[in-house]
């Protein structure tokens, strides 16, 4: 005489509950906490009614979103350091040109494109990354890092146009000074932003 597992339906249900309980408990932990403190650009892209949500674009689960976020931010950090190094080299070329070595003009122009492209790729990885697991309103190194990103992003957008303006401007010295000042502020904000990523708070 065979024994059917249905005779032990209470046991079967108990096993199901034990199996599902960790999954049920883990789900709320993966939900975005304190959404009201989410950065504006993240809300616009990944909020409940964000652009990517409307397109049904991206990973299907929060767990996969968080994995993608980690990968994107890791690559963002690597490219950001490369961008910082390239910008330092660009600044060096610029100061040498200011001293009269115009033989570096071609290198300065070529590396400006490489630097700009690397920076924008790095910035895109950060701005387009899925939301974090938790947000808060306290001051932290990462929040200052984000504020500084607005400064050096604006600088990187402006520097190429200010460089071209040197050639066409009626006041060469003034145009050159403006270009260098914006480039210096951009480099300083990027450097400080990079340092903040290594702080534990």
What does each of the following model-derived ranges do?
Residues 20-110, 121-139, 201:
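N-terminal targeting leaders of membrane proteins
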């Amino acid at each position: 005489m065979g024994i059917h597992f249905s005779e032990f339906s209470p046991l079967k249900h108990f096993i199901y509950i034990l199996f599902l309980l960790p999954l049920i408990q883990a789900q709320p932990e993966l939900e975005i906490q304190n959404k009201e403190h989410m950065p504006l650009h993240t809300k616009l892209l990944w909020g409940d009614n964000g652009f990517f949500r409307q397109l049904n674009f991206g990973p299907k689960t929060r767990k996969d979103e968080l994995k993608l976020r980690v990968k994107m931010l890791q690559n963002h950090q690597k490219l950001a350091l490369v961008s910082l190094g390239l910008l330092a080299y660009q600044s060096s070329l610029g100061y040498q040109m200011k001293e009269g070595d115009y033989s570096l003009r071609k290198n300065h122009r070529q590396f400006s494109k490489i630097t700009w492209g690397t920076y924008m790729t790095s910035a895109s990885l950060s701005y387009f990354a899925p939301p974090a697991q938790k947000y808060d309103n306290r001051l932290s190194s990462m929040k200052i890092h984000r504020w500084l990103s607005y400064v050096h992003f604006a600088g990187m957008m402006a520097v190429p146009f200010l460089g071209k303006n040197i050639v066409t401007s009626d006041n060469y010295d003034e145009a050159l000074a403006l270009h260098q000042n914006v480039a210096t502020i951009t480099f300083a904000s990027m450097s400080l932003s990079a340092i903040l990523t290594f702080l534990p708070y």
